Swiss-Prot record:
Organism: Enterobacteria phage T2
Compositional bias ranges of the Basic and acidic residues kind: 7-23
Residues covered by region (Disordered): 1-23
The protein, known as: Major prohead-scaffolding core protein Gp22
Highest taxon in the source lineage: Viruses
Function noted in UniProt: Gp22 functions in head assembly. Internal peptide VII: Cleavage product of Gp22 that is incorporated into the mature phage head.
């Protein structure tokens, strides 16, 4: 489903943002 892809992308984007903030 495309919706599942969107959810996955959102979660990955949040993780990347957290990593950048942690640095």
């Amino acid at each position: 489903k495309a919706e599942e892809e969107v959810e996955k992308n959102k979660e990955e984007a949040e993780e990347e943002a957290e990593k950048k903030i942690a640095e």
